[in-house]
Every structure is written in structure tokens, then in C-alpha cells.
A protein has these predicted regions:
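Positively charged, low-complexity/disordered segments
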Residues: 150-165
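ATP-dependent small-molecule kinase phosphotransfer cores
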Residues: 2-24, 62-121, 158, 162
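A short, charged/proline- and glycine-enriched loop
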Residues: 34-37, 120
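ATP-dependent NMP and nucleoside kinases share a basic, alpha-helical "lid"
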Residues: 59-60, 109-151
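Glycine-rich P-loop/Walker A and Walker A-like loops and their local beta1-loop-alpha1 context
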Residues: 15-29, 36-57
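Short, solvent-exposed loop/turn segments at secondary-structure junctions
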Residues: 46-47, 129-130, 154
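Short glycine-/acidic-enriched loop or helix-start segments at secondary-structure transitions
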Residues: 50-52, 132-135, 158-159
Length: 165
């Protein structure tokens, strides 16, 4: 009998750590922020945005910025993306748009000014938080794992800075 030449349970080993639960994540991130005054929490598909905003708003009262508030109006985004849509629900066209194309340049400029003038730490939350954040910001990618652990969320530190190197 022929033996299968594929791995039924593929995995990738990562360095660093995975942290579960927003209270623990926020506590750990506050320790790791050091002198950094900006924390960008970029959200992966499937993360409950309101849950994340609520958790961070409790700890960083009045200092949480929602990327959704920096987006262009819905009508403008529809106009921007309509050329990629078709009548077929399964097929469309691959877009050449970037995340920055969905953001309102004036709102982003105002947000960046507010960030640069801030005295206390600011948390930017949402898809594209790392795009809005300054280069020296601590960037965290948050993702949800509902299949295995209910509605628990995980954070993985990566990108421009990681507390694990």
C-alpha cells in the first residue's frame, strides 16, 4: 500500500508567544510599551471590533482612536470599488486598491497631528491601525479563534517592533 506524502496536520513553529484574553493582553502591552506613546492594534478578519474597543477604552479612557472613524464615507467607498464588482456573487475582479485608498486623507492627517501632540499614550484600533500609526509605534495584530476557544481573542506582536526580540 502506498504511503501518503502529505502532512495531515501541518503546523508552523513561531517564536514569541500567544496571549489569550483582553485583560491579560492589555496588561502585558502596557508593560511592554516602555516610552512609546502609541499602540496600534490592527485587527484581523473575524475579530469583534466593538469588544476590542470596549476593552481598551476601559484602560485608556479617552485615548482610543477608531480607524473606522478615519474612513471615507460609504458612498465614496462604493464608488471607489464598484469597478471591481460583478453581478456574480462568487466572482469579481482582484483590486489594485490599497488600504490607504479607503482612508480619508484629511481625517488621517488630523489624527496624526493629534497623535503627535498627545501627552499621554494613545491606542489606535481597527483594520489599518498600523497604516495610521507613526513608525515608532508598537504594533499588535489581533485575531480571533472562535473555533477552539469560544470568543477569546489573541494578540500577536509583529511588524515594526515586537516585545519578543
Amino acid at each position: 500500500m502506498r504511503k501518503a506524502n502529505y502532512d495531515k496536520f501541518p503546523s508552523t513553529k513561531l517564536t514569541g508567544m500567544l496571549v489569550q484574553g483582553w485583560d491579560i493582553i492589555i496588561s502585558m502591552l502596557k508593560e511592554k510599551m516602555d516610552a512609546r506613546k502609541v499602540l496600534a492594534v490592527d485587527l484581523y478578519t473575524g475579530v469583534y471590533e466593538e469588544e476590542v474597543l470596549d476593552a481598551f477604552s476601559k484602560e485608556f479612557s479617552g485615548r482610543v482612536m477608531n480607524v473606522r472613524d478615519l474612513m471615507k464615507p460609504e458612498k465614496e467607498i462604493q464608488t471607489l470599488t464598484e469597478r471591481f464588482m460583478t453581478e456574480d456573487v462568487l466572482f469579481g475582479y482582484v483590486t489594485n486598491l490599497k488600504l490607504e485608498d479607503y482612508l480619508d486623507a484629511d481625517k488621517v492627517a488630523a489624527a496624526r497631528k493629534q497623535i503627535s501632540e498627545a501627552k499621554d499614550a494613545i491606542v489606535i484600533i481597527g483594520t489599518g491601525a498600523s497604516v495610521v500609526a507613526p513608525q515608532d509605534a508598537m504594533v499588535v495584530y489581533a485575531r480571533s479563534e472562535e473555533r477552539r476557544v469560544g470568543k477569546e481573542c489573541f494578540a500577536v506582536c509583529r511588524s515594526r517592533w515586537s516585545p519578543y526580540h
